From Swiss-Prot:
The gene is PSY. One of its GO terms (cellular component) is plastoglobule. Disulfide bonds: none annotated. One of its GO terms (biological process) is carotenoid biosynthetic process. Residues 1-136 form a transit peptide. It is found in: Plastid, Chloroplast. The lineage of its organism: Eukaryota, Viridiplantae, Streptophyta, Embryophyta, Tracheophyta. Monomer. This is Phytoene synthase, chloroplastic. Pathway: Carotenoid biosynthesis; phytoene biosynthesis; all-trans-phytoene from geranylgeranyl diphosphate: step 1/1. The keyword Plastid applies.
Length: 423
């Protein structure tokens, strides 16, 4: 039985800002402690001082667990709506449940499922995966090198996911982006449903169709990425971070949810699957926020501003200031706040990377370390992301690889003694 109690509170009643999973408290009920139950966790999500209203939800379960989450927000008209983080959290729970169900139903490796039936010879599927690997090597060299440490089955599955994500992104950000319409995205989504049903259209689809038949991957993150492309077609401003968070989830956070079922959680890990997926989501959010901060000038020249409008206003800035592209003290202050937020998501992500299967950690660590350096470069450019593109030199990129490899060898955070938990 679950009891839900909701009340709307004003932002004045919330003196602190809490990001995604940034704070956890222990709450125990003497009644349930006497029954020998474990003390449960109290989690608080996305309560922003900049929001006019927040709706806090308390849940009490029959095991004595009490949860508080920002599942709803109230708009100025007084209408209650689901917050972006809660929408995403529901997808995380679904994906984590799929993995748990797969683990319970079969202790066998996900790598031993038979190939899907394809027209032609069995070599067609191998060729499809090989071509995916070539695309990954061409456009994501560092990440590709990291995947070479993974098992062949996991490696080629990650390549297939990468290629689908790249093709999807190219629809609205490639050479033919100006010709893409909502109906074209509808057709792409229908094609996605077909490949999940084992009806691929081409060799790249065939690779992904085989991948989703082998691993407990849900279609929802893929559908959500297509939704992110739709958002790009019709939206060029984001009034607050809640809106921007949802966009970041659609176009990048989804990648983490697609990848974890393939990369796998370390058998020895004591972490809950949900926490690992949350961390993967955080890495996607962090990467996209970093992309946004790096490309402010480039996006502005396209008439787009992927920055929270309310936070720009709080800093005394406007769209015109972004289009003018002059670095001022106000801009520096605003950027410091945005960079701090991105780093918070990177910190959240680090906790989950250690829980992945060891062979899968290196490419993820490499991505995390390299993207985080982009934030350092923005600072080194004195926050001029209007005319200077933050670029991590080849020397620094190469230097990050052995560091990433070293981190990939560490035992999962859930197994470390407290004295080593920050290593």
């Amino acid at each position: 039985m679950v009891v839900a109690i909701l009340r709307v509170v004003s932002a004045i009643e919330i003196p602190i800002r809490l990001g995604f999973s940034e704070a956890n408290w222990r709450f125990s009920s003497p009644k349930y402690d006497n029954l020998g139950r474990k003390k449960s966790r109290l989690s608080v999500y996305s309560l922003y001082t900049t929001s006019k209203y927040a709706c806090v939800g308390f849940e009490a379960e029959n095991n004595g667990k009490f949860l508080i989450r920002s599942s709803l927000v109230a708009n100025p008209a007084g209408e209650a709506t689901i917050s972006s983080e809660q929408k995403v959290y529901d997808v995380v729970l679904k994906q984590a449940a799929l993995v748990k169900d797969q683990t319970k139903s079969s202790r066998k490796s996900t790598d031993v499922k038979p190939d899907i039936v394809l027209p032609g010879t069995v070599y067609l599927l191998k060729d499809a995966y090989d071509r995916c690997g070539e695309v990954c090597a061409e456009y994501a060299k560092t990440f590709y090198l990291g995947t070479l440490l993974m098992t062949p089955e996991r490696r080629r599955a990650i390549w297939a996911i990468y290629v689908w994500c790249r093709r999807t992104d190219e629809l609205v950000d490639g050479h033919n982006a100006s010709h893409i319409t909502p109906s074209a995205l509808d057709r792409w989504e229908a094609r996605l449903e077909d490949l999940f049903a084992g009806r691929p259209y081409d060799m790249f689809d065939a690779a992904l169709s085989d991948t989703v038949s082998r691993f407990p991957v849900d279609i929802q993150p893929f559908m959500d990425m297509v939704e992110g492309m739709r958002m790009d077609l019709k939206k060029s401003r984001y009034k607050n971070f809640d809106e921007l968070y949802l966009y970041c989830y659609y176009v990048a956070g989804t990648v983490g949810l697609m990848s974890v079922p393939v990369m796998g959680i370390a058998p020895e890990s004591l972490a809950e699957a949900e926490s690992v997926y949350n961390a993967a989501l955080a890495l996607g959010i962090a990467n996209q926020l970093t992309n946004i901060l790096r490309d402010v000038g480039e996006d502005a020249r396209r008439g787009r501003i992927y920055l929270p409008q309310d936070e720009l206003a709080e800093a005394g800035l406007s769209d015109e200031d972004v289009f003018t592209g002059k670095v001022t003290d106000k801009w520096r202050s605003f950027m410091k706040r945005q960079i701090k937020r991105a780093r918070t998501f990177f910190e959240q992500a680090e906790k989950g990377v250690t829980e992945l299967s060891q062979a899968s950690r290196w490419p993820v660590w490499a991505s995390l370390l390299l993207y985080r350096q982009i934030l350092d470069e923005i600072e080194a450019n004195d926050y001029n992301n209007f005319t200077k593109r933050a670029y991590v030199s080849k020397v620094k990129r190469l230097a990050a690889l052995p560091l990433a490899y070293g981190k990939s060898l560490l035992i999962p955070l859930s197994l470390r003694p407290p004295s080593l938990s920050k290593a």
